[in-house]
Swiss-Prot record:
Bilayer topology annotation: Single-pass membrane protein
Disulphide connectivity of cysteines: none
Gene (name only): Cox11
Protein name per Swiss-Prot or TrEMBL: Cytochrome c oxidase assembly protein COX11, mitochondrial
NCBIfam families noted in UniProt: PRK05089.1
Stored PANTHER family: CYTOCHROME C OXIDASE ASSEMBLY PROTEIN COX11, MITOCHONDRIAL-RELATED, CYTOCHROME C OXIDASE ASSEMBLY PROTEIN COX11-RELATED
Keyword Transmembrane helix in record: yes
Organism (species): Mus musculus
Homology family: Belongs to the COX11/CtaG family.
Described function: Exerts its effect at some terminal stage of cytochrome c oxidase synthesis, probably by being involved in the insertion of the copper B into subunit I.
Record-linked InterPro entries: CtaG/Cox11_dom_sf, Cyt_c_oxidase_assmbl_CtaG
UniProt subcellular location: Mitochondrion inner membrane
Pfam families in UniProt: CtaG_Cox11
GO biological process: ATP biosynthetic process; intracellular monoatomic cation homeostasis
Assembly, per entry: Interacts with CNNM4/ACDP4. Interacts with RANBP2.
Length: 275
């Protein structure tokens, strides 16, 4: 029989002798005989017997129910620990780069449109006319009489805007270094005030860097009352350097196009420097 049952205790019980363990009272010996009996084998029997005696204590190396799963112990191998630390450092670096790239792409998406328009306005690329002329430059220009250029005009209206918009002339002939004046006409046929705003471009695109507008109605809000009709002037010139550019040798036709959109009051397109 296992547990804490000892043959000597059975002998004491059967012979009726007053045997006792040193330090134990007689009552404790009797209690031991009563609680440590056959059938209580193994560690389970010992634990139940000691609980009945009131002397049971949990062994030092035994823990209670775990409140959380044990952590994975770090490797005792120095090389493996260094490798794990290196992987953690690399993962943090990659996450930092990914987050920075995401923020940068978000900022670039907001700034792309105004920056591209400003770039086109400065360089003339993308079919945008160049601003930044001065009165002295205009007064000192020398017309290139033997280089006649045909300028045609086009007008479009976005589906959101219920306006009638058209050029008053279909074409004019100019020479580089000479100013020219053209007109567009816009009408609001509705029964309520409408605010419109226009953009423009020049074709061919390469000619945009030489097409300078002194005065126009683009990128500015235009408010038309019900049934109101207005004339919109465009005062422009073609830079004399147009005639000296080898790329413009075969260019004798330039088209200026305007497109009107409906705008909310107080809204302006973020393109500085346009006239």
């Amino acid at each position: 029989m296992g547990g804490l049952w000892c043959p000597g205790w059975r002998l004491v019980a059967s012979c009726g002798r007053g045997w006792r363990q040193p330090g134990w009272s007689g009552r404790t010996v009797v209690n031991a005989e009563l609680v440590l009996r056959p059938g209580w084998d193994g560690l389970g029997g010992a634990e139940r017997g000691l609980r009945r005696l009131g002397t049971w204590k949990r062994p030092c190396g035994v823990r209670g129910p775990a409140t959380q799963p044990p952590r994975r112990p770090r490797s005792s191998n120095p090389f493996q620990r260094a490798q794990e630390d290196e992987w953690r450092r690399r993962n943090k670096t990659v996450l930092t780069y990914v987050a920075a790239a995401a923020v940068g792409m978000l900022g670039a998406s907001y700034a792309a449109v105004p920056l591209y328009r400003l770039y086109c306005q400065t360089t003339g690329l993308g079919g945008s006319a160049v601003a930044g002329h001065s009165s002295d430059q205009i007064e000192n220009m020398v017309p290139v009489k033997d280089r006649v250029i045909k300028v045609t005009f086009n007008a479009d209206v976005h589906a959101s805007l219920q306006w009638n918009f058209r050029p008053q002339q279909t074409e004019i002939y100019v020479v580089p270094g000479e100013t020219a004046l053209a007109f567009y006409k816009a009408k609001n046929p509705t029964d309520k005030p409408v605010i419109g705003i226009s953009t423009y471009n020049v074709v061919p695109f390469e000619a945009g860097q030489y097409f300078n507008k002194i005065q126009c109605f683009c990128f500015e809000e235009q408010r038309l009352n019900p049934q109101e009709e207005v004339d919109m002037p465009v005062f422009f010139y073609i830079d004399p350097e147009f005639a000296e550019d080898p790329r413009m040798v075969n260019v004798d036709l330039i088209t200026l196009s305007y497109t009107f959109f409906e705008a909310k009051e107080g809204h302006k397109l973020p393109v500085p420097g346009y006239n």
